Amino acid sequence: MLQALLDSKDFLALTLAHPEQFDGEFSFNLGDHTQVEVWDTGVIVFEPIQNEGKDIVLSCGVHGNETAPIELCNSLIKQLLQQKIIAKQRTLFLIGNPLAINNGTRIIDENMNRLFSGEHSNPPGLVNPERVRAKKLEAYVDRFFTAAADGRQRIHYDLHTAMRASKHEKFAIYPYRPGRAFSGEQIMFLAASGVDTVLFHHEPTTTFSYFSSERYGADAFTIELGKVYPMGQNDMTRFIATHEMFMRLITAKPLELDAFDADKVNLYQVCRVINKHFDDFEFTFATDVENFRSFPKGFVLAREGGQEIKVEHEFESVVFPNAKVPIGNRTVICLIPAVNADVR
């Protein structure tokens, strides 16, 4: 495996050729500047001999059909392996769900991005590939962050694409972080990366980004980089700014960020999450409605169990509507413009 990676510089191809696991860990050096460690299929660490004080996790492919972030990360990995760019920050890349990527599907058995913060081991336990992999991914993040000295900035960008069109093509979800202000610098970094819209979440979740934020104090985000397309059919020119800023971050080049300015970004706060309680749950709007579509107060969003679910605020925007989830799962997130968000 080591020789195959050294020859091809294509970590994604190696991962997809061995989607369940590698035959053990291996490591090698790039020149006299970087140690590379491969911990598992889809798990590769770049450890600069001299680093600048940030620990960065870039994860992709938690959902197997969300291919643009996978191609973006593989491009960065390839450039690092080819020594076209040199890491100056400790960086962990995670290709989340190789089995689903090979299958060309979002999941194999279960939505992995609902299985973190230990949810993978709650009943029914480690009964499917997503649950097993989520537990491993948590362990790799823990190993990576705890191997470095305390006091360093920890960053985790969990990269996705959405199943539907969006009023805001690229947007990020800022996990709930009670007692900690939101980072204006991080929001402006995202804006410079082409991600000009941020949603402030209002409660704990079992997503990958919340896990890193809550457990390790990381500046963590779930980042949606556009719409789902098959592998090889993404217009990668739409990700030039994202690639450039991630490259600058990894190589410790000047980020040249603007000071935080709420007028330069779109800021929303989650006002509620609507979960499914009955099999007859259905939305009143079209199934192909775009993310961030806004509805006025009193509008009937959905019906279930003989009850109507109405818009409660003057206007609410919806993201990730999906009526076909299991009972107990989230059907939609409702948003209002952010008011008095603690951004510093």
Curated annotation (Swiss-Prot):
Its EC number is 3.5.1.96. Its cofactor is Zn(2+). It catalyses: N-succinyl-L-glutamate + H2O = L-glutamate + succinate. Pathway: Amino-acid degradation; L-arginine degradation via AST pathway; L-glutamate and succinate from L-arginine: step 5/5. The active site is at residue 224. GO terms for biological process: arginine catabolic process to glutamate; arginine catabolic process to succinate. One of its GO terms (molecular function) is succinylglutamate desuccinylase activity. Binds 1 zinc ion per subunit. Belongs to the AspA/AstE family. Succinylglutamate desuccinylase subfamily. This is Succinylglutamate desuccinylase. It comes from Shewanella putrefaciens (strain CN-32 / ATCC BAA-453). The lineage of its organism: Bacteria, Pseudomonadati, Pseudomonadota, Gammaproteobacteria, Alteromonadales. The gene is astE.
